[in-house]
Amino acid sequence: MSRRCELTGIGPMVGHNVSHSNIKTKRRFLPALSPATLQSESLGQSFKLRISNAALRTLDFKGGLDTFLLGAKDEQLSPRALKIKAQVKAKAKAAAQAA
């Protein structure tokens, strides 16, 4: 399992620990990932994804999983999230044709 957010694509970053005497040693900044079960309103289904805490706040701000996925770029999303996005798009298209 990679240390990468499935929705935003945020992964580990590198930097330095800097001591008082200005000696720099390499270190990694890992994203704060947590497993989250997210509900898709249009599909009526829940999905378990490993996302960052920042992505969870963004989901709340955007109004849910469906609206976040429809506005997200495909390059950021994991293969699992891309499949969910395709299902949401297909469901929205079917609903638009029925109405």
UniProtKB/Swiss-Prot annotation:
Alphabetical list of InterPro entries matching this protein: Ribosomal_bL28, Ribosomal_bL28/bL31-like_sf, Ribosomal_bL28_bact-type, Ribosomal_bL28_sf
GO terms for MF: structural constituent of ribosome
Superkingdom classification of source: Bacteria
Disulfides per UniProt: none
Any single GO BP term: translation
Residues forming coiled coils: none
CC annotations in GO: cytosolic large ribosomal subunit
Pfam families: Ribosomal_L28
Keywords assigned by UniProt, alphabetized: Ribonucleoprotein, Ribosomal protein
HAMAP family per the UniProt record, alphabetical: Ribosomal_bL28 (MF_00373)
Similarity comment: family membership: Belongs to the bacterial ribosomal protein bL28 family.
Protein name: Large ribosomal subunit protein bL28
